[in-house]
Amino acid sequence: MKILVIGPSWVGDMMMSQSLYRTLKAAEPDAVIDVMAPAWCRPLLSRMPEVNEALAMPLGHGALELGERRRLGKALRSKGYDRAYVLPNSFKSALVPFFADIKTRTGWRGEMRYGLLNDLRVLDKAAWPLMVERYVALAYDKQRFTRASQLPQPLLWPKLQVSEQEKLTTAARFGLAAERPVIGFCPGAEFGPAKRWPHYHYAALAQLLIDDGYQIALFGSAKDKETGEQILETLQPHSREHCRNLAGETQLEQAVIMLAHCRAVISNDSGLMHIAAALDRPLVALYGPSSPDFTPPLSDKARVIRLITGYHKVRKGEAEEGYHQSLIDITPARVITELNTLLGENQEDACRS
């Protein structure tokens, strides 16, 4: 069985999609699964043992480019795929498998993709509340499985592979001290400060952890570098040597390895949060206006802190510097209590194993 998956274009969604690959591979161990996704996804896909090959999608996120998609599809015919799974909901994402003449093309209806998909699923959001459940459902017969509660349990959550040698080599390359365990902070989030725990709370937490013998690694893209600098500048001067701002300094590949090296991770609702969960790191996930009811961190070692309910489509908070009040109200003391509980549980698990 040869399978082509048209993968998502967001870090968090790409991570959650691994649950589908794991489910397909568990059902058919000899299945060959290729994933077509933006080239930046390769560092994630290469660490998913279920994926045979990461195929770069050369077209931009919003580009239709019908002729190029036809060319791509026809070029894939020689690979002889038996099935395709289309994870994005867009019309254009279903074109390549259609032009590749793949016999069975599975996906949710999305943008009215009748004809393009011939194993079409109509989404009942109440029956399939979690994104990961919607992905996994595609592996099963739509007549037999009509709601998430019918899926075999437990779901196979995302699980990335990183070697111990990679962790040590990469940590040394970025100047992390071997004698202090690392706590990772992911202080960024898409769409502005409303989804971010305030930098001054991160700084207060960092100070507590540094005083307790840890070092801090700040992760994120180049646009998160300023937030990292704000955290650093708020620390006591003698503590700054134990906090490393890696935002914008690491490629995604290196960030994955470094997150795997962390003793634990504190994160806003972001793609890096989902990566940390897939690396099985003790994780405290901080939510405000966005909701964990749809895309929670998929890990037994994750704890979510959220002080409000429901989903609030807010890109800029009402408080100073654009933060959301519900995130301001999460105190560093609450976070460190949750973190210490997680670290204690993780230590007990390590002793038992």
What are the roles of these predicted feature ranges?
Residues 1-353:
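Catalytic machinery of carbohydrate-active enzymes
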